[in-house]
């Protein structure tokens, strides 16, 4: 189920403060956050946000197409190494 339209998008308050400071100060340094659940707002466009994936912070450059999505969608948590080789095919 999706979030109710009357509630509006969710974004952590501490992340919004960091974004407002970065926009006001014209700072190009990535904003480090652990808030994967926050929705990307139009104010984030043009900023680089370092989203934590459980091991490290992945830099995500925010574009117009990303508005409305969650930050966690762009920082993958699992690394796919490929399926195991078929033993019958090797013979």
Swiss-Prot record:
NCBIfam families for this protein: rpsS_bact
Q: Fetch the PROSITE patterns from UniProt.
A: RIBOSOMAL_S19
Gene Ontology terms, MF aspect: rRNA binding; structural constituent of ribosome
Q: Which organism is it from?
A: Cupriavidus pinatubonensis (strain JMP 134 / LMG 1197) (Cupriavidus necator (strain JMP 134))
Q: Name one Pfam family in it.
A: Ribosomal_S19
Q: Which family does it belong to?
A: Belongs to the universal ribosomal protein uS19 family.
| SUPFAM superfamilies reported for this sequence | Ribosomal protein S19 (SSF54570)
Example GO biological process: ribosomal small subunit assembly
Q: What is this protein called?
A: Small ribosomal subunit protein uS19
UniProt GO cellular component terms: cytoplasm; small ribosomal subunit
The protein's UniProt keywords, in alphabetical order, are: Ribonucleoprotein, Ribosomal protein, RNA-binding, rRNA-binding
What job does this protein perform?
Protein S19 forms a complex with S13 that binds strongly to the 16S ribosomal RNA.
